[in-house]
A protein has these predicted regions:
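C-terminal regions of RecA-like/P-loop NTPase motor modules
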Residues: 1-16, 149-152, 226-235
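The Walker A/P-loop phosphate-binding site
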Residues: 7-110
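A generic local structural motif
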Residues: 37-41, 78-82, 141-145, 178-181, ...
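Conserved catalytic network of the ASCE P-loop NTPase/AAA+ motor domain
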Residues: 45, 84-88, 119-121, 148-150, ...
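Phosphate-binding/switch region of NTP-binding enzymes
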Residues: 52-53, 58, 63, 172-235
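Alpha-helical scaffold elements adjacent to nucleotide-binding pockets in ATP/GTP-utilizing enzyme cores
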Residues: 67-68, 103-111, 142, 146, ...
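Conserved, well-folded catalytic cores of nucleic-acid-processing
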Residues: 71, 75-76, 111-114, 164-167, ...
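Conserved inter-motif catalytic segment of the P-loop NTP-binding fold
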Residues: 86-169
């Protein structure tokens, strides 16, 4: 399948292929996107789509996505998250764009403990990448390559999306990143769940990327510290 990017102008032959690929027929049978992530009985994620967790700084967004990853890894209910990935979609790619390897290792161990798996043994279906040291453009390319070359991939966790951009308020950069999410999820039939901070003074996700995320994501989960007990976060 030809890659659809904004970097080159497609030839007429390529455009003809894209039109054929995008055509919707009234007689074809198109299956509904399979539900793969749920909170209790509410669907929050399907294959071919992406979702997000948003919240203020220190609201335990990473812990929240750790629970999602643990449920997908174990097939069990973890903190009310349930997962139903097909057998050929059991691989998880967890990408952290902010933290170094030591912190990422702690997150990895937490996921394994939540999944009730040993935290001193390499998990078969979970790959974690720390992309802190790379430039935004390189991070995006690394993720694209990892998604394209990981067999049996079903779930990609990206903590966080902001670090794919040089300017969080750039409309062109934001559109490019969200377009990549739509392309990857559709072409590979995976689910992507990402993380973004909220503004300090309101409930909106930060920057133009937050606006695009709100407009295009299948589900937005808001994570916030409990007003009665600061040690607890609620979704």
């Amino acid at each position: 399948m030809m890659e659809k990017t904004d970097e080159t102008i497609p030839s007429r032959e390529e455009l003809a292929v894209y039109i054929e690929e995008a055509a919707v027929s009234v007689t074809n049978n198109y299956e509904e996107a399979p539900a793969v992530l749920m909170v209790d009985d509410a669907v929050i994620g399907t294959l071919g789509n992406f979702s997000a967790s948003i919240g203020k700084a220190k609201s335990k967004k990473t812990f929240n996505v750790s629970a999602i990853a643990a449920s997908a890894l174990s097939g069990r209910t973890v903190l009310r998250y349930r997962s139903m990935f097909p057998e050929n979609k059991r691989k998880i790619l967890y990408i952290d764009t902010e933290q170094g390897r030591h912190h990422c290792q702690q997150v990895l161990k937490r996921i394994l403990r939540l999944a009730e798996m040993p935290d001193d043994k390499v998990p078969e279906n979970l790959i974690m990448l720390s992309l802190r040291k790379f430039a935004p453009r390189v991070r995006l390319l690394i993720v694209e390559e990892a998604i394209g070359t990981t067999p049996d991939l079903g779930l990609v966790i990206i903590d966080g999306i902001r670090d794919f951009l040089y300017d969080i308020n750039s409309s062109s950069e934001s559109t490019e990143v969200i377009s990549k999410f739509m392309q990857w999820t559709d072409d590979k039939q995976i689910h992507i769940h990402t993380v973004l901070h909220q503004n300090k003074n309101d409930e909106h996700a930060r920057g133009h990327i937050g606006t695009e995320l709100n407009n295009k994501a299948e589900t937005i989960l808001q994570v916030e510290v409990d007003k009665e007990d600061k040690a607890i976060s609620v979704v």
